[in-house]
Structures are given as structure tokens and as C-alpha cells.
Amino acid sequence: MSKLPTVLEGIVEGRRGHLPEIRERISHVDVSALPASTRSLYDGLRGRGRGEAAPAFIMECKSSSPSLGMIREHYEPGAIARIYSRYASGISVLCEPDKFGGDYDHLATVASSTHLPVLCKDFIVDEVQIHAARYFGADAILLMLSVLTDEEYASLAAVAERYSLDILTEVIYEEEVARAVALGAKIIGINHRNLHDLSIDLGRSARLSALLPADAVVVSESGIRDNATVRELAGHSNAFLVGSQLTSQPDIDRAARELVYGVNKVCGLTTPTAAQAARAAGALYGGLVFEDASPRNVSRETAAEIIAHEPDLTYVAVSRRTDGYADLIQEGIGVVQVHAPYQGSTDAEIALLDAVTDNVPENVQVWRAVSMTGDHDGAALARALVESDSVDALVLDAGDGGTGTSFDWSGIPDDVKDISFLAGGLTPDNLPAALAVGCNGLDLNSGVEYPGQAGRKDARALRRAFETIRRFATPKDPS
């Protein structure tokens, strides 16, 4: 057994002190009669990730942590679990009370609120904790090799097996990986957090996963803060365990969507059902076009109806006008996208964007569509607009947009990608290449419509597109 890090040692000793209370809490239970679990975390994770399939997620219910303190004051694990059930393959529930604000009541609430397997996230040192975990609804438990000897692990694993509980075996060091393999662990959790000082090393899962057999299920834990990190680590991880990054956000559903799919927009929405399909598929933003000449034009009244029926998208008001953007603002509009023709110079572009910014509420973002195929140098303009800090985001497109036409993506400057959406001719078939460009997000439109029916979104094409987005793993640098 590894020497216990100081932070972990304190938590474990505290948990040992809780054992009498746990025994008393389930003293009325005939543990030999507890039913076996029928929900398998292992089955939900195996065959996922590793660059071959979409990675899985174990999303965690927690209200506080040693590194962050209080994360979520109004903590409702049942409601959180119902959100997670849309995106995850399993749900983890903190049960340690002193540092994480956990309780077995939370475990029972989550187990009753989801169809997914539920992991009891605890610092387990005694079999009574496993009895309690199963009694309150757990389908899997966490066993930490930094806490347990091989003999203790084997004894606790035998208890878990009686209840058909899967085991997430957590490792931090190479020596623990070797022990996990020798002990026959099937699900290996690689914790990026240094339990001495609580620092994060995201390279740990790559190093340690290389030491595991090919059939091991690898779960990357701690420090998974965004979709870019997921894509970077997906080549050697089957799944990701994420908690604080989700429960710390005011809108957990949006945070989960962003973690799983990234930041993407579906433009040219014309009906409530299309907006609902876009959001259900994984979009964060929905584009509403306010242009009479566009086949995707919507009236203010239609826009209001769309927003009312699908309020969980952030809506982008798209227009070619050069003024009057305030007229487009209504409840649900969080962005205006300036699609006006090129203004003739960088100074004129900045002046236009400054005027639009002054014309809309402070909480409404301003995006600029930049043609990468016009007479002007689109790449130079994009760079200049980013340097001027006059926009919140760029939408890099071909021509006037909405034509289904692409452009040469190799011409996109690296220093604008983090603030840019890639648009123009994106279809479910070319999305892997588009994602490899490395822009902040994608802007889908005609490529997810029925052929020859501009403005009519194909819900199955949307779903296929976002399934492709979810599967994407960042290609490894050959160097």
C-alpha cells in the first residue's frame, strides 16, 4: 500500500470514525438478504472511447470538495441525476459527509431518480460501507489502492461481488497500476489529482493507461473541465468521471451538453420542433435568421414561439443589417450575429461592431460573420477583429453563408480558432475533418436539412451530426 497523502489520510481517518454510526444506521438490515444489483456500470463503459467509439461519462453529484469548498449551496441530487441521465452512462454520488457534504440519503435519492447504474463514491475501508452502499441503492463502489492493502482490497471486493456490485479501482501511481492488474480489477480509475497538494496532472492517464491490458476499462478522473480536454484524453480513456465542473454551474444541463458535445450552433431554425431536435441532439446555440430574402427567415412572432417551446438553447439573431439590432432582441436572444457585407476596411468593420455593441444590451454577445472567400483577405480581417477585441466570437463562412458551400480551412489563422465557429458546407460526413481544424465550435445549417428544402431541418441528420461530434478524439501529435 502506498503511503497515505496527508489530505487523504485525514479524510480516511474521519471515515473510520463514522463506522459505528454507519453500523447503527443499518443495524435493522439483514445484509445477507440484500438483492444483487441489476444495473452494470462495467457494461455501460466497456467498448467506449479509446478513439473507437464515443467516450462514456460518469457524472457526479457533489455539493462540496476539499479543493473548492462549497460548490453548490442548493444541492438537489435527484434533480441533478435526472439531468445526468440524458448524457451519462453512470452517476456517481458522494457519500462522505465532512469534506464532500455527502450522505447515504443522496445515494438513495439518485438511485430512485435514474435508470443508470449508480456509483457510491466513498472512502471505503470496511465492509459495512459496502452493505450500506447496496442497501441505499448503489450498483458500484469505489475502492482506492492508496487506502487499501491488497488483502483489504480482495476482502472488500469479495463482499461487493456478493451483491454484483462493479468496482471502480482508483490508482495514482505506477505501482498501484501493477497492483490493480494483479488483483484483477476490471474498471481502473486514473486520478489526475495529486492527493498531497491537490494539484492536477492531466498527463497521468496517458502514462498509466499504457501500462494496462487492452481490455481494461479506463476512467479518467479529476481536472476534466471542458470538451477540449475530453477530446485530448479520449484516445486512451473509455470514460470520464466529472463532478465539480458540472455541479458548480448554475445551468447543469447546459454544462453537461457543453462537456459532452462542445460549443456548437444549429443555424436557420424555423420551427419549434427543429429547435427541440437541435437541443436534444446536443446544440448549445440556435440561429434565428431575420432576413426577408432568406429562405430561413423568421418573423419576430415565430422567433418568440420557437424560443417559448425550446428555452434551453441560447438563441442567435442573425441579420445582414448594419443598424437596428436592438429591434431583434427579445427574451431568449443571447447573441446577435452581424452578417452585413464587408465594410471596406478594418477600421470600418470595427466601427460597425462597436455601434452594434452599443445598440444591444450589455448581456448580449456580438458575433461577426467573416467571409473567407470574398474579395478581401478574410484571414487578415479575422485576425484584426480578434486583436481589436471588438467581437465575442467570429463565424468563419464561405460567401454570404447558408449556401452549403465550404472553403479552404487550411487558411484559418491558428490565433483566431479559439474564438471562432467554423461554418459553411458542414455535413455529418465531413464533420471529423471540420473538428480536426480546431475551432472553438461548429455552425451547422444546410448540411442538416432535407435535400432541396432550405429551412427544414432533418432531425435524424442532426442526431447523426452530434453523434459524430461526440465520437471525435483530437488526433495525436506524431512528434
Residue ranges and their predicted role:
Residues 68-161, 165-168, 174-179, 205-208, ...:
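N-terminal active-site wall of soluble small-molecule enzyme domains
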Residues 2-74:
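An N-cap/entry alpha-helix motif that binds or orients negatively charged groups
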Residues 132-152, 189-199, 236-259, 283-296, ...:
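Glycine-rich phosphate-binding active-site loops on the catalytic face of alpha/beta enzymes
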